[in-house]
Amino acid sequence: MYSFRRLALLLALSLPAMTVALAQSSSSSSNPAAPAQAQQPAGQSQGQISVQARIKARREQRRSAAIHEAYNHLYEAYVSGGYLRFQPGPGVPAMGSAPAGPALQRANIYAWDTGLTRFYSERLGVTVDGRGYFATAYVYNNQYNITNPAISEYAGLIGPTYRFYMQPKYSVSGRVMGGFIHGKFSGDLGSFKPAQFGLWPDGNTFAASVSIPVEYNLTPNIGVRVVPEYFLSGFGSTTQNSLGFTLGVSYRFGQQ
């Protein structure tokens, strides 16, 4: 009986110690799971970033390939129609006791324009351009009964072209050209002189053009282009500053 009491006393004293030990063991076994759970969202986030980076890289590769396909051509030919506001002459000068006539109004000139660009890279090329301008110039009422004579001009230009913005479907370029222009202002005047009507004299002079060609690609080889332009000419030992545009189609061919 005495032994049984001693055994019961030992069990009663050891029970709290066993409870504490089990609690500590449970706590230590559960702690490593917390970092593992914390690391799992970080791993998922890095995986999502990696997938997005791959998608972005593939998209950029496709874009670069499309740009290369559209602009890696050796030549680009174009044909356009155009419009220009041009000063056809200074007006009738003073002669003897007769006063000078009024300055002539600007004429609405319609044009054809064709050219070829040889590219040395996807961006830089040299353009050779030929164009013709046609209009009637209003020279006011006069004693000759000629009020709207036909005038024409023909120009040849050359200069650099640079594509400063390229996308698979469109591009924007800058172009500067210089050359000569021939003016024919006496076509409808018979034996009269252009100066009698205030027009520029027939002849050749310098010409220059500054323009911004904008092209929209229908295919990698064919595009539609609009070209706003500043055009400078030098008839009559003066300068004519004209603004206009051309609208047409382009065809790219050959491989660099």
Whereabouts are the PLM-identified features?
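Transmembrane beta-strands of outer-membrane beta-barrel pores
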Residues: 81-87, 130-136, 178-184, 230-234, ...
